[in-house]
Swiss-Prot record:
Chief location of this protein within or outside the cell: secreted
Protein name (record): Conolysin-Mt1
Other facts noted in the record for this chain: The mature peptide does not contain cysteine residue.
Domain of life: Eukaryota
Keywords on record: Amidation, Antibiotic, Antimicrobial, Cytolysis, Hemolysis, Secreted, Toxin
Expression across tissues: Expressed by the venom duct.
Function: This cytolytic peptide has ability to disrupt the integrity of cell membranes from both prokaryotes and eukaryotes. It permeabilizes both negatively charged prokaryotic (PE:PG) and zwitterionic eukaryotic (PC:cholesterol) model membranes. It has potent hemolytic activity on human erythrocytes and exhibits low antimicrobial activity against the Gram-negative bacterium E.coli (MIC>50 uM) and the Gram-positive bacterium S.aureus (MIC=25-50 uM). Intracranial injection causes mice to shuffle backward until the encounter an obstacle, at which time the mouse jump into the air.
Serine amide, modified sites: 22
Taxonomic placement: Eukaryota, Metazoa, Spiralia, Lophotrochozoa, Mollusca
GO biological process: defense response to bacterium; killing of cells of another organism
């Protein structure tokens, strides 16, 4: 994996959690 992926993946997880909570 590229180092950037390890930074992007956690950010996407946080966004998904926010969407699930708001939903």
């Amino acid at each position: 994996f590229h180092p950037s992926l390890w930074v992007l993946i956690p950010q996407y997880i946080q966004l998904i959690r926010k969407i699930l909570k708001s939903g």
